[in-house]
Amino acid sequence: LTPDGYNVMLRGLMGDAIKFTRIKYGNGTPGDGANALKNPLLSLKIASATRSEKYVTLSVSFKNVELEITGFWATEIGIYVEDPDDSTKELCYCIWEETEVEKADYINPNVERLLASQYDFVVFVSEAENVSAALGETLVYATVTELNNHKNDKNNPHKVPQEQTGLGHVENKA
């Protein structure tokens, strides 16, 4: 946790909301006590959030061909929350840092080959009860679970009329 993140978590334990907003990737080295990434290069909205006992799992996903950046080694990743005192601002809740560049992930916007990436981050929130995330539109595709849920939805989720399916003459017994 960053110093700001620690304060947000303590306030969350006292009943304030903890609202995760985005995840940023950079190629800097923030160092101890940092409240922000040293060199943020990519900012992604959260695609999904799942709460467990003392943690929240945040997922982000993207396709390399949609990135408007040059390639970089992601040596720092920051998870951001809404500032509890000013909802128009964000605070860095926690930072992950890789000091050995060769162990970091390379974010490659190379358009010659499509790479779809999903990252899941398990973030400690202790016993804070009011935890949420501002979800953005994913930049990739539906997950297998989402596709299976849609496939198994027998309530005509696309609202296709019987006539369009060639079943206009069949009586609806549902």
What are these model-derived regions, one by one?
Residues 1-137:
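N-terminal assembly/attachment segments of tailed bacteriophage virion structural proteins
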Residues 129-174:
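Fibrous stalk/shaft segments of extracellular and virion attachment machinery
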